[in-house]
Amino acid sequence: MTRKQRRLMLIGVCGAVLAVALGLVLWAMRGTIVFFRSPSEIASQAVAPGVRFRLGGLVQEGSVQRGPDGRVAFVVTDNGATVPVRYQGLLPDLFREGQGVVAEGMLEPGGMFRADTVLAKHDETYMPREVADALKKQGHWQGEAKHPGGTAPAPQTASGEKPALRQQ
């Protein structure tokens, strides 16, 4: 073999090894990739029962029902469609009706979503990106409040005074 043929053979073997390695990594990750869906997407698309995904939206007002042994049932909505959810376990402290939630689990044949994990928003301004995108897509996004003139009000102390700026 000439030097050029050996070099091409080495490049080909390296390319094949990289392709096999990439294939093995993707095959190993196939069970850990979980897609996000909103209630409207579930209603409009046929989601096969038993497929894991994340369901995101708002906890519908008046829908939370707590049962024995830590069982909880509630409804997730995006103001376009609703999906009933069943969960057994401890809910996050910030889980409330009307708040953003992301539940990970699978849809059962009857249309009930069985959640393994429930995540609640952690402060007043945070909403999971997927939930915000789904609400924007449905036209229900209210966004951040705009201040007159397009600027935020000046910060104030508890007594109403404006704090002095520190020089560095």
From Swiss-Prot:
SUPFAM superfamilies for the chain: Heme chaperone CcmE
Keywords, in A-Z order: Cell inner membrane, Cell membrane, Cytochrome c-type biogenesis, Heme, Iron, Membrane, Metal-binding, Signal-anchor, Transmembrane, Transmembrane helix
Taxonomy, superkingdom: Bacteria
GO molecular function: heme binding; metal ion binding
Binding locations of heme: 122, 126
GO CC annotation: plasma membrane
Region (Disordered): 134-168
InterPro entries: CcmE (IPR004329), CcmE-like_sf (IPR036127), NA-bd_OB-fold (IPR012340)
Cytoplasmic side: 1-7
Places the protein is found: Cell inner membrane
Ranges annotated as spanning the membrane: 8-28
One Pfam family linked to the record: CcmE
Major localisation: membrane
Role this protein plays: Heme chaperone required for the biogenesis of c-type cytochromes. Transiently binds heme delivered by CcmC and transfers the heme to apo-cytochromes in a process facilitated by CcmF and CcmH.
Xref: HAMAP family: CcmE
Protein name (database record): Cytochrome c-type biogenesis protein CcmE
